[in-house]
């Protein structure tokens, strides 16, 4: 039991939310052609451009900070392949905790 709902209900809603994020922002289907991580391509490229500038001594800033929402943070994390984040499922398989290690809370800490 949690303070607000039975543990079984909390687990159900957590898995439902992760499934929703998996398809809308995460790795999605194998057949999707990585469409979600493609959205983050520009941000990923800029990230490495900034790192290269630091390495080359051409960066005047201590850090380049960006504000973003889960709608782009999850695709960015997916494109970095963090903690097995880049594991799409076949179109014939439905996401659940038994067949995928992908979890939204790992990606954006909520």
What are these regions (language model features)?
Residues 1-110:
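Non-catalytic terminal regions with compositionally biased, polar/charged low complexity
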